Design a protein with these regions (language model features):
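Ser/Thr/Asn(+Pro)-rich, low-complexity disordered segments
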Residues: 2-49, 54-371
Length: 371
């Protein structure tokens, strides 16, 4: 609200917009032309309209029931169990990429910056849920941060994949803008969370400082395209852009990175403004499309960004949720990057991006369906 109607009442708006009421009265009473009289009526009722438009939207958020809370807690415990059981000294306290149980049982002993960041967040979430104490949080977080500090980097950025048994980068050294951004923004959240528990274990304050040091050392200038005001997809092992393609859509997993880079002053605000906002409509909703139409692109950034109610991003998320619900099979919905029914020579599931065609710019083959 503006200062002119700061008490929020109609009387307050009338008191501070007397000139509008007076001018509207004169125009309505004495103007010879109907158009002027109509303008006078609008001016007369302007304070009332301004008050109604400035009033807060009623919050329709529902409080979770006890049953829902227990269900969420059970899901959280099962998710944390993956990290708890698979992260150890054998993996240098880094999480494996995935665990496959059939048709061949195997563990993918590789990891990425996003995987590492989510593991660190899972430790913090486990403390929030009460699954572990602050001492265990400090011990395990310290072990992982210690390993991260030893990993080979380029200008403070982690490479895209590491062998967690040898800690060496895998394949041709490559630095992904979105993976690097995910990791750094997750560390920002982790540091804030560790501060909340630092009174219970002094080591947590030191670990929060270590997280901020890693964030501070990460150079995102290598991804910046000054002509397009966007981020390159990634860079080679020497920090040079690979190709000319940039992340150019707001409904993308890069949204978190772009928001933080602009908010922290690392890169110009033009970055946020340059992201495409291509609009479409479906099932009574209007919203922005993404490249692949996946849940990951729309909803993953919302783990970290506050969603402003009734904003265009909020409407686009509702649009995406509606599209995902309509793209269901046997009541199950939610399509994103995942494994699918195809195998490599070692009988490992292949992995690629999947999405809802009506939410995507990408074209999908007919009959392809994954949930």
């Amino acid at each position: 609200q503006t200062d002119s109607g700061r008490d929020g009442s109609i009387c307050g708006y009338l008191q501070n917009h007397v000139a509008s009421v007076f001018a509207g009265t004169l125009m309505t009473a004495f103007s010879p032309l109907p158009l002027y009289r109509l303008c006078g009526i609008v001016w007369f009722f302007f304070p009332v309209l301004a008050c109604l438009l400035a009033s807060p939207v009623r919050d329709r958020t529902r409080t979770a029931t006890d049953v829902q809370r227990r269900t969420v807690s059970r899901y959280a415990r099962e998710i944390f169990a993956f990290f708890d059981e698979n992260v150890s000294h054998k993996t240098h306290w880094l999480p494996p990429d995935n665990l496959q149980l059939s048709p061949a049982e195997c563990t993918a002993y590789r990891t990425s910056p996003t995987n590492i960041g989510f593991y660190m967040l899972s430790l913090l979430a486990a403390r929030d849920f009460g699954f572990i104490g602050s001492a265990v949080l400090a011990e395990r977080m310290g072990q992982t941060i210690g390993t991260v500090s030893r990993l080979e980097k380029c200008r403070g950025q982690l490479y895209n994949w590491y062998d967690i048994k040898t800690l060496r980068p895998l394949g041709n050294r490559y630095i992904s803008a979105v993976d690097s951004g995910n990791f750094v923004t997750m560390l920002v959240c982790v540091a804030a969370g560790l501060d909340e528990y630092s009174h219970e274990d002094i080591r947590l304050a030191e670990l929060a400082a270590d997280c901020r040091s890693i964030v501070r050392d990460a150079d995102f200038g290598m991804f910046w395209n000054p002509k397009k005001h966007m981020l390159y997809l990634g860079c080679d092992g020497e920090g040079k852009p690979q190709g000319s393609i940039c992340y150019d859509m707001l409904m993308s997993e890069i949204r978190t990175t772009c928001y933080w880079l602009c908010a922290s002053g690392r890169l110009p605000k033009k970055l946020w403004q340059s992201l495409s906002r291509t609009i479409t409509a479906e099932n009574g909703y209007i919203g922005m499309v993404s490249w692949a139409g996946s849940c990951f692109e729309y909803f993953m950034p919302e783990l970290f960004l506050k969603r402003e109610k009734d904003s265009f991003i909020d409407e686009s998320l509702r649009f995406a949720l509606s599209g995902q619900k309509h793209h269901r099979k046997n009541g199950i919905f939610g399509v994103s990057e995942s494994g699918y029914f195809a195998f490599d020579p070692d009988m490992n599931y292949r992995y690629k991006v999947h999405g809802v065609p009506k939410l995507a710019l990408k074209r999908y083959p007919r009959g392809e369906f994954v949930v």
